[in-house]
Curated annotation (Swiss-Prot):
Keywords: ATP-binding, DNA damage, DNA repair, DNA-binding, Nucleotide-binding. One of its GO terms (molecular function) is mismatched DNA binding. This is DNA mismatch repair protein MutS. It comes from Methanosarcina barkeri (strain Fusaro / DSM 804). ATP binds at G637, P638, N639, M640, A641, G642, K643, S644. The keyword Transport does not apply. This protein is involved in the repair of mismatches in DNA. It is possible that it carries out the mismatch recognition step. This protein has a weak ATPase activity. Belongs to the DNA mismatch repair MutS family. InterPro entries: DNA_mismatch_repair_MutS (IPR005748), DNA_mismatch_repair_MutS-lik_N (IPR007695), DNA_mismatch_repair_MutS/MSH (IPR017261), DNA_mismatch_repair_MutS_C (IPR000432), DNA_mismatch_repair_MutS_clamp (IPR007861), DNA_mismatch_repair_MutS_core (IPR007696), DNA_mismatch_repair_MutS_N (IPR016151), DNA_mismatch_repair_MutS_sf (IPR036187). Pfam families: MutS_I, MutS_II, MutS_III, MutS_IV, MutS_V. One of its GO terms (biological process) is mismatch repair.
């Protein structure tokens, strides 16, 4: 370090050298300051003033940016949410007591996935750190794609939740990316082998912050040993991951990264849960977006999402649990029915449900409160919130024990009853902490009187000091006879007795001179000196003792962290169940039936979101699908008629059913669905340089490669992003492929404007045609929103254009062009599946592009164009009966000229 740098700047550079890729918040008195390039970054991102102070290593003026220490909760989240890592370098000793330069050191590193402060994330969402481990596994065969064995872990240090799984994935990492979409981590850490894999790292970066991190271990075996040491267990078998090497490795990577950034052991992370993808319906990022499960497409908020419709939970734990349920619908009919039994019971018992929801409304975020307690960054207000939450639980427990029958509700009641210390912990906090404590835990004022005798005495000394001084002053006036005598205080000389020079002859002999002034003398007595020592140290001692008592309370609560976290989980589950019952009753939902066959039967189904937003009532529709005759539903009809809404509502009803929710229908029976695939909507992926059509084909490829007979596929307007012939050919091939896949086919809803596809109903036995009914009233088009059997051969495009507000001149011209095309009798040949012969029908969907192609080169779907000659056109318009001989002769000359 250069001699021109101050000792404090030397400390700053030492911290920066230790954390080169991290912004440094360096505590200087009442400010956190940053220097050099960090200062420039912070000033820009936080929009604060950039100044300069001192010299850098080269002797130049050092850029400086700073924020008040008490405003860190305002500014820090803004940097973290932009993906920065921030190292907090604190003063490690009291500057007043420091000998020389104040000791400073980094006490924690805040990253997007390891934030603990509630200001940095939403109560309704988990803040996951994702860790990935894996290895490429070659497959035999010249053209075989390689696979990867992948382990993934998710850790939320704010709640203590810790999950891991392991699976085999393709070289495109579809399963891993689906997990990413479902869990939505704030940060992902990768070992170098995966970090340097462009196929993975770039796709991860598109959705989260990605860091390279390798834990300080030799391999999975050592990772397992360290996990066992952390959890204080002899084996990981009870956690389900004993032989899952990559899951174990990723789990330790997540925990080591979290403990390294927080610079402490995270004892509130006290269990690891292993889960399998085979337990849950798969909803990939495309499906989550298209169906707007937890956020909408418009602004990625939750308005008009399924989550928003269903989320009337009373607690943060309930909000988070509901989101997890929606992102991971169950595949087990038995487990789904456990949830449905509870929802049904709570629906049938409205008074019980009302009481439970009323009590739950007093429960705060127990999970995160406990996390902060164990972590050590909680304050007295957190303890008051925890106390109020615990006080609300005994009536919940007792009411459940007395009134419930269903399995899940009984498990919750028994679990709450097993927490024997619940009331004692609430009582301890109530006896110790004042009702409205200050935020700071180092300034006193948070412990109630009567909790600790020593503290009461110190507080009494401190609070009664003014009265004692007043009494002492009055006593000395009477003893000395000096009416103007006064007792004062300043920081330099402490307490003193002041006597003016005019009264100096009356000063008692036991007064000891302390200070001489121009017009007065200041004295003290042994009694005043002794009291001064008590007064000045009492407040300091009281504050220190309060903090000590507070710390003891935290330790007591920490000893029960596991029971508190389990209680929080039970309350979250109860909150979701009461919420689903409330929503079911308010929205007229019914209990669905779940089966292990492939049938889907929905009567009077409604879109759960749209029915809450439309005016004038929602038109319900039926859906009937099976594996024999109605496996592939081909839906035709005009734009805006409701095809997409119908398809989406079918999928949403199925998802709700497998979540364990009642559904918007009069009857519903759902054959378990393992994955919902969607190809709906059109947009360009500009970030990846992909056009609308390319995006469509990538999503379609994923569906065709991965859909199983247990899946549900929604396809909307496949092929519209390219030429008509290409689009039609692709659409037809897709229908045939899905219908014939694995000889049993795939359940699918396919909306299209290629009306020629409706002929496939006669060729493919499990394809069935449906269309959206419309009614024409003059030039007006009335959408009936009803899905009815059979096909339609009209798109009503011009009528829809009129409804959209297209200028009337354009509408009129479009009608003229349409009539002209119809007069020209543009025909196409399509294959009649009944007899294999060609039949002719009007090509209403492809007029504009058909002439771009050679009719004889259309891959079997030839288009024959019969254009009338100019002479034929004139002849058709003639009315021979009304023509005179002269007029007939003139017309004949005109026809001859046309022929020439």
């Amino acid at each position: 370090m250069t001699k021109m740098m101050t000792p404090a700047m030397c400390q700053y550079y030492e911290a920066k050298q230790a954390y080169p890729d991290t912004l440094i918040f360096f505590r200087m008195g009442d400010f956190y300051e940053s220097f050099g390039e960090d200062a420039k970054t912070i000033a820009k991102e936080l929009e604060i003033t950039l100044t300069a102070r001192g010299k850098d290593k080269s002797g130049e003026r050092m850029p400086l940016a700073g924020i008040p220490y008490h405003a860190i909760d305002t500014y820090l989240p803004r940097l973290i949410n932009k993906g920065y890592k921030v190292a907090i370098c604190e003063q490690l000793e009291d500057p007043k007591k420091a000998k020389g330069i104040v000791k400073r050191g980094v006490v924690r590193v805040v990253t997007p996935g390891t934030a603990i402060d509630s200001s940095m994330f939403s109560d309704a969402s988990n803040n996951y750190l994702m860790a990935v481990a894996g290895r490429e596994i070659g497959k035999p065969g010249k053209n075989a794609e390689n696979e990867f064995e992948i382990g993934v872990s998710f850790l939320d240090i704010s709640t203590g939740e810790f999950l891991t799984t392991q699976f085999r994935d393709s070289e495109n990492f579809e399963k891993l990316l689906s997990e990413l979409a479902r869990m939505r981590p704030s940060e992902c850490i990768l070992p170098s082998s995966l970090y340097e894999n462009p196929a993975l790292a770039e796709r991860l970066r598109a959705q989260t912050i990605v860091q390279e991190f390798a834990p300080d271990i030799s391999g999975a075996k050592e990772a397992g040993e360290r996990l066992k040491n952390h959890f204080r267990v002899a084996t990981l078998e009870g956690m389900g991951c004993e032989n899952l090497d990559f899951a174990v490795y990723s789990a330790w990577a997540a925990l080591e990264y979290a403990q390294t950034t927080q610079m402490r052991e995270l004892t509130h992370i006290n269990t690891l849960r292993t889960y399998s993808n085979s337990e849950f319906m798969i909803l990939d990022s495309v499906t989550l977006r298209n169906l707007e499960i937890v956020k909408n497409v418009r602004d990625e908020g939750d308005e008009n999402s399924l989550y928003r419709i269903l989320n009337h939970t009373k607690t943060p734990m309930g909000s988070r649990a509901l989101k997890k349920w929606l992102l991971k619908p169950l595949l087990s009919v038995e487990k789904i029915n456990y949830r449905l039994d509870a929802v049904e019971e709570l629906t049938a018992k409205p008074l019980l449900r009302y009481d439970l929801r009323n009590w739950l409304s007093d429960v705060r975020d127990i999970e995160r409160l406990v996390g902060r307690v164990v972590y050590g960054n909680s304050n007295a207000r957190d303890l008051v919130a925890l106390k109020k939450s615990l006080e609300a639980l005994p009536p919940v427990r007792d009411s459940l024990l007395e009134n419930i029958e269903s399995t899940i509700l009984n498990d919750i009641a028994v679990g709450l009853a097993s927490f024997s210390e619940l009331e004692n912990l609430a009582e301890m906090i109530d006896r110790a902490i004042v009702d409205e404590p200050p935020i700071s835990v180092r300034e006193g004022g948070m412990i109630k009187s009567g909790y600790n005798a020593e503290l009461d005495e110190l507080k009494d000394i401190a609070s009664n000091s003014r009265q004692w001084i007043a009494n002492f002053q009055q006593k000395e006036r009477e003893r000395s006879g000096i009416k103007s005598l006064k007792v004062g205080y300043n920081k330099i000389f402490g307490y003193y007795i002041e006597v003016t020079n005019a009264n100096s002859s009356q000063v008692p002999e036991d007064y000891i001179r302390k200070q001489t002034m121009a017009n007065a003398e200041r004295f003290f007595t042994p009694e005043l000196k002794e009291k001064e020592s008590l007064i000045l140290t009492a407040n300091e001692k009281a504050i220190a003792l309060e903090y000590e008592i507070f710390t003891e309370i935290l330790q007591t609560l920490s000893a029960h962290s596991r029971e508190l976290q389990e209680t929080a989980e039970r309350i979250g589950t109860l909150d979701v169940l009461t919420d689903l019952a409330e929503v079911a009753e308010n929205n007229n939902y019914i209990r669905p039936q779940l089966t292990d066959d492939c049938k889907i039967l929905i009567r009077d189904g409604r879109h759960p979101v749209v029915e809450n937003t439309v005016h004038g009532g929602f038109v319900p529709n039926d859906t009937e699908m099976d594996c024999k005759e109605n496996q592939f539903l081909l839906v035709t009809g005009p734009n805006m008629a409701g095809k997409s809404t119908y398809m989406r509502q079918t999928a949403l009803i199925a998802i709700m059913a497998q979540v364990g929710s009642f559904v918007p229908a009069s009857y519903a029976s759902i054959g378990i669905i393992d994955q919902v695939f969607t190809r709906i909507g059109a947009f360009d992926d500009l970030a990846s340089g992909q056009s609308t059509f390319m995006v469509e084909m990538v999503e379609l490829a994923n569906i065709l490669n991965n859909a199983s007979p247990r899946s549900l596929v929604l396809l909307d307007e496949i092929g519209r992003g390219t030429s008509t012939y290409d689009g039609y050919s692709i659409a037809k091939a897709v229908v045939e492929f899905l219908h014939n896949r694995g000889k049993v086919g795939v359940r699918a809803l396919f909306a299209t404007h290629y009306h020629q596809l409706t002929a496939l109903e006669e060729k493919l036995k499990r394809v069935k045609n449906y269309h959206v009914a419309v009614k024409e009233e003059g030039h007006e088009l009335v959408f009936l929103r009803k899905i009815v059997p059979g096909a339609t051969d009209r798109s009503y495009g011009i009528q829809v254009a009129r409804l959209a507000g297209v200028p009337e001149k354009v509408i009129e011209r479009a009608n003229e062009i349409l009539k002209e095309l119809e007069r020209e009798n543009v025909l196409e040949e399509v294959e009649d599946s009944k007899n294999g012969k060609k039949r002719k029908s009007k090509a209403t969907a492809r007029y504009t592009q058909m002439m771009l192609f050679d009719p004889g080169d259309s891959g079997g779907n030839t288009a024959k164009v019969n254009r009338p000659s100019p002479v034929e056109t004139v002849l058709k318009k003639l009315n021979v009966d009304e023509m005179t001989p002269i007029e007939a002769l003139n017309k004949l000359h005109e026809l001859k000229r046309l022929l020439n």
